[in-house]
Amino acid sequence: MSNSMVNEAEPKELRDESDFEAIFSGGDFTSVCGFGSLLSERSARSTFPELINFRVARLNGFRRVFGNVAPIFFERGIAKPETKEISSLCAEPCEGETIIVTVFEIKKSEIPAFIQREIEFRFLAVLPETLDGKLYDKPAVLCSRSTDEEFFQVRCKGNKDIFLQHYGRHNIDKIWRDDILPCRVYLRHCILAAKNLGETAYNNFLDHTFLGDRSTTIREYLASSGSGIMEEEPPESLKFRYGG
């Protein structure tokens, strides 16, 4: 069986800490896949100061999509609801697609905080491969697309108060949408991070990352209605955090 066939097999969903423990039972560390801001080692280290073994890898059977509303952009003052430029990034299964990612290890003790920080996502255990095609022998966690229904039932336990705690103060009633656009500061950051990883990662990000319509690539978006994004500087207080 080829590496790509192994890699595109149905990934295992990790619903809670016990699922993480079952998959990552050996050793004190858990592998994480970065595909957006975590393409930046600086960003990754700001979130996981004690991470180890930061490296570039390939993940078959997935694409990137700007299709989820992120409260953090509202909190940091960089969301633009009037133009719908409020989206963060997810990875979603897509046969025949490939994305360049980063992989690194975090301490298992960091998993509960990781789950809370990325609470809107579906966590999948995936098998990346090296850039020369050698399949990893251990899985990594990927933050994948979820649904509003799954978030409400699984993460919020069907409790509207929990949903409102996460999203209500920003008047967000739907997380997963196909009619929103990338947060400009965040998109610029991700592109710079990919560029810092080299030409292969840069071109992969431009051509295998899509708007919510799942047909417009980021390369096409930057050449049309998204033009000018790369020339815009982040607010002074966020220049380090969103500087690529």
Regions found by a protein language model. Name each.
Residues S2-G244:
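Glycine-aromatic micro-motifs
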